Amino acid sequence: MNSELKPVKNFYRREIMLDLPPGSNFMYRQCNNMGFLAEPSCTIYTAGFDTEYTSDDVIVVGDEVSNTYLLAGAVTAYRSFTFFTLIKKAANQHKIEVRQPDIMEGETPEEVVILRGNDWKKLLEDYATIVAERNNLPKFGEGKNLTGYCTWYYYYADVTEKDLLENLDAMAKHRSSCYAADVVQIDDGYQTFQGDWNDQDETWPTPLPEIAKRMTDSGMRAGIWLMPFLASTASRVFKEHPDWFVKDENGNPKVSKGWSPPPDDLWVCLDTTIPAVQEHLKNVFQTFRKWGITYFKMDGLGFGLMDGKRSDPDATPLSAFRLGMKAIREAVPDSYLLGCCPPFMACLGYIDGARISNDTRACRSAIDHVTKTNFARWWMFDKFFRCDPDVVIARQDRSTASIGDNRLSIMTGIMTGVSITSDNLNTIAADRLELLGKSAQIRMRDFRPAGHWGAGCWPVAFSGTIDGRKAGAVLNTTDEPVTVKFEDMGLDPEQDAEELLQDLGKRKYVITVMPHDAVLLKQ
């Protein structure tokens, strides 16, 4: 009856006993990739008597009445991820179990830090600083906003060379306008099969080196999309080197179901513990680099953690993943590496930027979700890497989003300092182009949730600085108008503030924001 129940290997497990006030029910939870536990919120009310709640990489628990909080967070991820489970007993937050499933008992565990304090948001900010210092990460995002064009969110996989070149010309024409693009990036469509990244599909007649030169001659960096650790079973690289891939228990390449249409839908994962595979990765990126490409959108990174048999029996999926990332970084040290579907901790030190939300779309539900996911990870901004909020959307065509939805989307670029778009500048309306330009020209630094943010809800008020001056924002993703006092955004209620998104003029004391809309104030 229980023949399918298998014993669990004896991996690293520890527990943190909690001594919180009775009735403590607050928890902040995290996902270790760009997806997010977004509903009802990343802050939850831990109801129940004897039950469990999980979080990846970091967890905060505590009591909102007495402002007593404890944070536990992973500081390193060299061989294993760290998972946290809050265990409740008799309705109390009893203990946190710490699991590192790829660390065996007796092996050196990944480092974990425990912090205590009366401000859970400050604990997360302090935690991010500790991680950055421990991993010797550089300072990110000190210059101007990163701007550019990506084909995906307008054309998706149906993009043609003609589409790209028309948008390249539009971006070049507008470089002297309010939106000056730094990068033009091809996103899918150019390759023959997933995995054969340097093999150009015949539907793209102009060689990629010539396209890249046209981009750079226009004053922009040339960028490209690829999934470096994956190949489809239809690819040339898989057919020529089936021994290069992670294997299942029977010694066959292990297959996962991908999101691409057939015949590209069955994916295998490169075994990056094989030296020849590391050289293959280096060659792929160096070939692109020789063609003039210096911006790489590396997608599907989480698939590079496939469990299975590798050439090095001592490697874990995470340690093998980092070998691959190291090879790529060494191959193109002067290029910008953007991680998508990125396991955050495993990527530290190897990437310049990381997507921190799911894919967006030009509709309200997606923009709301992406907005919340991005501001919920404010503590990562410019500490782990440049946080990429996914593309900002201002366009009126191929869209069901309202102008208010667009302002929320634009705010994700302003808060992170990354403002890539897929909007077609040949068809965008003048007022929408002006709005898009704000995401390129304005950076709200020191961005953080302001006022009260309790369990089971989302904040609406945020504080920060713009050009060294006090700034506040209201991001209303609800179905009702919200009114926010200036002091709840860290602003002086007696001092005029200029509204920057809607051109509302000078305001003071309070501001009311309509449903699914945003305002940005600077004093």
List the model feature ranges, each with a label.
Residues T412-M415, I420, H452-P493, H516:
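Carbohydrate-binding surface patches
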Residues A180, I224, D334-C341, I420-E434, ...:
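Acidic/polar loop patches that form or flank catalytic/metal-binding clefts of enzymes
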Residues M1-D126:
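N-terminal accessory beta-strand-rich subdomains and adjacent acidic, glycine-rich linkers
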Residues Y155-D158, Q191-Q194, F229-A234, F303-D307, ...:
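Flexible loop/turn segments at secondary-structure boundaries
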